[in-house]
Regions:
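N-terminal substrate-binding region of glycoside hydrolase catalytic domains
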Residues: 1-83, 88, 95, 99-181, ...
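Glycine-centered loop/turn motif at secondary-structure junctions
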Residues: 90-94, 197-198
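Noncatalytic carbohydrate-binding groove/subsite architecture in carbohydrate-active enzymes
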Residues: 146-150, 154-291
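A structural alpha-helix within SAM-dependent methyltransferase catalytic domains
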Residues: 8, 83-90, 190-194, 235
Length: 291
């Protein structure tokens, strides 16, 4: 409530609010990466609103990493708190843009092979746009442009289906495969927004540059195909009144220019942005407000 009051005071003409909610990835190799909701601590739970996200309680959820006895991230908000926040924003006459966000909780000396080099450790807290194949395109033994690349992308997205989710007593329940994958992440929040009566807009993804540029053939981009299916599924959950889109990174939106000497340019996101379920072309760009 205080945050909304401060927003109204500082930006009186505001009409729309982005609601950013994070799950946490644990590996830059897409076939090894899991995405999970996490908490900052397990010392005490909220009353009368205990922490619950996608079937995880505070006692069963993972804890975000700590450095010098301090959490390096804020945790995932409880589902119930998100419903309250959406309701409050709507009461204030503000449009809600729901933004599921991937944070990479990878710390020093992680022992995870770096897909972009021969290093035995992946970088600390990397950008989600660096999630890629077991070996990135251009690296020796990369599966890019082979069927194996498609299989690795499929492992990241997972097999969760719309029918695996149910709304029971105002909560989202999941009964699908025992996996923590991208489809489970996005479809969970699509159903949560449905409980809230819908939102103005919903991002099905953002800044997944290292994934969207993966090829399982010369001109076939399996992540884009997976996002197209995800858009259809989210549309089935949220109906026709919620705008859907994908927010590309500023270095991703204009096409893929493989650094292989071919001179090729692939407008790989066009099939996604052109499909009927997508309402807007999103672009994450960080422009300075002043000199």
């Amino acid at each position: 409530v205080h945050a909304i009051e401060d927003l109204r005071a500082d930006v009186p003409n505001v009409t729309s609010v982005s609601m950013v909610v994070s799950w946490f990835g644990d590996d830059l190799r897409c076939n090894e990466c899991t995405l999970t909701p996490r908490v900052e601590h397990k010392d005490a739970d909220g009353r009368p609103m205990p922490w619950l996200v996608s079937g995880q309680t505070r006692s069963t959820a993972q804890i975000v990493s700590y450095v010098e006895d301090r959490p390096v991230f804020g945790g995932t908000p409880a589902d119930a708190s998100i419903l309250e926040a959406i309701a409050k924003l709507k009461d204030e006459g503000l449009d809600v843009v729901f933004y599921p966000f991937v944070l990479m909780d990878i710390q020093e000396n992680n022992g995870l092979p770096d897909p972009y080099s021969d290093n035995d450790n992946q970088p600390v807290m990397p950008w989600r746009g660096r999630i890629t194949l077991s070996k990135a395109a251009g690296q020796a033994s990369s599966p890019d442009q082979t069927a194996a690349a498609g299989a690795e992308v499929a492992a990241f997205f997972g097999a969760a289906q719309v029918s695996d989710f149910a709304i029971v007593n105002g909560e989202v329940e999941y009964s699908g495969p025992n996996e923590w994958t991208y489809r489970r992440f996005i479809l969970h929040y699509a159903h949560l927004c449905a409980i809230a009566g819908g939102v103005e807009a919903f991002n099905i993804g953002s800044e997944l540059r290292g994934l969207t540029q993966i090829r399982d053939g010369l001109d076939s981009f399996p992540t884009v195909v997976a996002l197209q299916q995800l858009a259809r599924d989210v549309r089935a959950v949220l109906g026709p009144n919620t705008k859907l889109g994908y927010a590309a990174d500023w270095s991703e939106y204009f096409g893929y220019h493989p650094q292989d000497g071919s001179g090729d340019v692939w407008f790989h996101l066009d099939p996604l942005w052109a499909q009927a379920e997508i309402d807007y072309i999103g672009l994450d760009n960080y422009m300075p407000l002043s000199d």
